[in-house]
Amino acid sequence: MERWFWIGLGGAAGTLARYGLSTWCQQRFGAEFPYGTLAVNVIGSFLLGAIGEIAATTELLSPTLRLSLSTGVMGGFTTYSSFNNETIRLIEYKSWAAGLANIAITLVVCLLAGVLGMVVARRLIAG
């Protein structure tokens, strides 16, 4: 039951961080393109790549901490559902080009961010 508490607490923290970053991005860059969702998914992919690498190659993270960070914090921080909804809205109401760009940018950049997170974690671990 303790593990559930920490995962839930992590999820709440991730959700609040997502809301804060998304709001900031919308205020800074405008609402014409879902910059906030893109930012949280890229950052989350990087961090989840790093967390996964650290968990897989060291004993620095207990199983509860690993789940709290990955399932909790990163699960609350990243958002496929918002990406999906915003992409559909772009295509439906505004622009096929913007919607397809959102798909391509999100897939490629998030994948690269995840790999970069793993590489950075490996280098940090190696010292």
Swiss-Prot record:
What GO biological process terms does the UniProt entry carry, in alphabetical order? cellular detoxification of fluoride
| Compartment(s) of residence | Cell inner membrane
In the UniProt record, does the keyword Ribonucleoprotein occur?
no
**Single GO molecular-function term?**
fluoride channel activity
Q: How does it sit in the membrane?
A: Multi-pass membrane protein
Query: So what does this thing catalyse?
Result: fluoride(in) = fluoride(out)
InterPro entries per record? FluC
GO cellular component, as recorded: plasma membrane
Task: Kindly state which keywords UniProt assigns to this record, in alphabetical order.
Answer: Cell inner membrane, Cell membrane, Ion channel, Ion transport, Membrane, Metal-binding, Sodium, Transmembrane, Transmembrane helix, Transport
Binding-site positions, Na(+): G75, T78
Q: Where, by residue number, does the polypeptide cross the bilayer?
A: 4-24, 36-56, 100-120
- Tell me what controls its activity: Na(+) is not transported, but it plays an essential structural role and its presence is essential for fluoride channel function.
Task: State its role.
Answer: Fluoride-specific ion channel. Important for reducing fluoride concentration in the cell, thus reducing its toxicity.
Hey, which family's this protein in?
Belongs to the fluoride channel Fluc/FEX (TC 1.A.43) family.
Q: Specify the protein name.
A: Fluoride-specific ion channel FluC
Annotated source species: Sorangium cellulosum (strain So ce56) (Polyangium cellulosum (strain So ce56))
